[in-house]
Amino acid sequence: MLSALARPASAALRRSFSTSAQNNAKVAVLGASGGIGQPLSLLLKNSPLVSRLTLYDIAHTPGVAADLSHIETKAAVKGYLGPEQLPDCLKGCDVVVIPAGVPRKPGMTRDDLFNTNATIVATLTAACAQHCPEAMICVIANPVNSTIPITAEVFKKHGVYNPNKIFGVTTLDIVRANTFVAELKGLDPARVNVPVIGGHAGKTIIPLISQCTPKVDFPQDQLTALTGRIQEAGTEVVKAKAGAGSATLSMAYAGARFVFSLVDAMNGKEGVVECSFVKSQETECTYFSTPLLLGKKGIEKNLGIGKVSSFEEKMISDAIPELKASIKKGEDFVKTLK
C-alpha cells in the first residue's frame, strides 16, 4: 500500500523541469568540490526548482562555482571557501545537503568512516544550527546510521532541534532496488518502486520487495540473492572503482531526487513520498528509515513499515541490534564534544 502512494522513481527528477511561481528554493551543498558534491551541484543547477545555489568546501569551491555559473539556467551560483566563509554560505537557505566527508575505499565499511566523518558532520551541522536553523538538513555523509543521530544531538545542543527537518538520505538504496528488480523482470525502472526501510549500511538496508509496485514475485533463492545485492551494492561499486572512490554519480542522482521531492513538497505539492532515515517511533530503534509523506514543513506523516513478509520481518529483527549500536555511537560522539 505504501509504495502505491509513492510516485515512480524518476518522476521527481522529471518534475524538476516543470515551471512554477514557487520555484525559488535556496539550496546549499556542503562538500561541493568532492566526488558526490560536484555532480550533485550540477543536477541542482540544472533544476528550475532552485533559484540560489551556494557551494561550500575547504578546497576548490571558487572553481566549481565559476564552472557551474556559466550554465544557462536560472539558479545563481556562489562558492564559499573555508570555515570563515561557511556562515555566509548558509544564511537564508531553505535546504542544506551534506555530502562532505571521506569516501570508502576497498575493504572499508561505511562504519570505518566514522572517526573522520563524525567530526566533519558535527562541525557543519553546528554551523547550520547557528546560521540556518529552520532549513531542511539532508545528510549524505556516511555512516548515515550514526551521522543523523549526530546531527540531531548537535541541533538539540543549540536549542533548535526539529525532527521533521533532519533527513538521512537513503534514496540510493531505493534507486538500486528499483533498478535491480526492473533488470530481473524486464521492466522500465522508472515505473518500479521498492520501499527500502531500516538503515543505510549492510544488513540494516531492508528492501520490501513484497511491497513493490508493480507487484513482483521471486523464488526464495533469487529473493535472497537480490536482497544481498541491494545491501552490498555500494561495495560492488567500491570494488569496481578499485581504490578510485565509491558511488558518486548514482549517489548524486539519488541526492538530487530526494532534494527535488522535498522542494516539491515544500512548494505545496501533495502526495510526495520518499524513504529516509529519520527520528522514528516505528520500531524500538530511535531512528529508522520508512516511507515518509513530505510536506511544507518537512515530514508531514511517517507512513510506517506496513505489511511485510516473514522474510522481511526477520531482516528487521536482525537489523535492530546493529542499528541501535550505530545510533548510540553517534549520540555518544556528540557528548565528547566541547
Curated annotation (Swiss-Prot):
Record InterPro entries: L-lactate/malate_DH (IPR001557), Lactate/malate_DH_C (IPR022383), Lactate/malate_DH_N (IPR001236), Lactate_DH/Glyco_Ohase_4_C (IPR015955), Malate_DH_AS (IPR001252), Malate_DH_type1 (IPR010097), NAD(P)-bd_dom_sf (IPR036291)
Enzyme Commission number(s) of this protein: 1.1.1.37
PTM annotation (N6-acetyllysine): residues: K78, K91, K165, K185, K215, K239, K296, K301, K307, K314, K324, K328, K329, K335
Main location as per UniProt: mitochondrion
CDD domains: MDH_glyoxysomal_mitochondrial (cd01337)
Effect of G37R: In DEE51; severe defects in aerobic respiration, when assayed in a heterologous system
In-chain residues carrying the UniProt-annotated modification N6-succinyllysine: K78, K91, K185, K203, K215, K239, K269, K296, K301, K307, K314, K324, K328, K335
Main enzyme class: oxidoreductase
Pfam family name, one: Ldh_1_N
NCBIfam families in the cross-refs: MDH_euk_gproteo
Subunit record text: Homodimer.
UniProt protein name: Malate dehydrogenase, mitochondrial
Organism annotation: Homo sapiens
Gene it is expressed from: MDH2
